[in-house]
């Protein structure tokens, strides 16, 4: 018989693939007992127990599957395995979870077929989408044009008009130099 301390040791590299992710186990522990600090040794024991439980259920479900000459283990095989191993309470909870999963899957299927049930061909939907994109581009160009025109108008307000109606330009430095020579 093996030493109980050896069973608590982390699994070897080859067994590491057969365990649940430690982060998942830690999250479950934290959710179930948020105010309790759980030692690493206890976490490792829980991880090993979970892995052993899954292995036990999987093996029994495989036997049920083989007895029925099936090649794929399905939910009914797992539920029967729970029953055969004496986990009647787990079976009832597993059935409830299975029912919920089936409802979610059916809802997902309904949502994915919603586009198909519109009755509009995909080509028409694509054409409508392209039209909407073109309208959005036109609207954006119009807004940018209006913004540009308002900036131009603001710049015109800052420059005073000349007598002939044209707008005075900012004097250049060369013009200033010419004026100094006249004195």
From Swiss-Prot:
Q: Which CDD domains match?
A: HFD_Dr1
By its UniProt entry, which SUPFAM superfamilies does this protein fall under? Histone-fold
Task: Using the UniProt record, give the first listed, main subcellular location.
Answer: nucleus
Task: Give GO BP annotations, semicolon-separated.
Answer: chromatin remodeling; negative regulation of DNA-templated transcription; negative regulation of transcription by RNA polymerase II; positive regulation of DNA-templated transcription; positive regulation of transcription by RNA polymerase II; RNA polymerase II preinitiation complex assembly
Region (Disordered) residue ranges read: 155-183
The segment(s) forming the Histone-fold domain are: 19-82
Compositional bias, Acidic residues, is annotated for 173-183
Metal-binding listed as a keyword? no
- Family per UniProt? Belongs to the NC2 beta/DR1 family.
What is the protein named?
Answer: Protein Dr1
Q: Which organism is it from?
A: Drosophila melanogaster
Task: Kindly list the organism's lineage.
Answer: Eukaryota, Metazoa, Ecdysozoa, Arthropoda, Hexapoda
Q: Which gene encodes it?
A: NC2beta
């Amino acid at each position: 018989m093996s030493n109980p301390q050896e069973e608590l040791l982390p699994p070897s590299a080859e067994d590491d693939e057969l365990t649940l992710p430690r982060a998942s186990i830690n999250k479950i522990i934290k959710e179930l007992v948020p105010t309790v600090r759980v030692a690493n040794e206890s976490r490792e024991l829980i991880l090993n127990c979970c892995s052993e439980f899954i292995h036990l259920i999987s093996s029994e479900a495989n036997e049920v599957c083989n007895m029925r000459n099936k090649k794929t283990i399905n939910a009914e095989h797992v539920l029967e395995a729970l029953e055969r191993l004496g986990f009647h309470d787990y079976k009832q909870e597993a059935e409830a979870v299975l029912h919920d999963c089936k409802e979610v899957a059916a809802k997902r299927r309904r949502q994915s077929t919603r586009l198909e049930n519109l009755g509009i061909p995909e080509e028409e939907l694509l054409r409508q989408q392209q039209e909407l994109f073109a309208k959005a581009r036109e609207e954006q160009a119009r807004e940018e044009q209006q913004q540009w025109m308002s900036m131009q108008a603001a710049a015109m307000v800052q420059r005073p008009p000349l007598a002939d109606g044209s707008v005075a330009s900012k004097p250049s430095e060369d013009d200033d130099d010419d004026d100094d020579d006249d004195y």
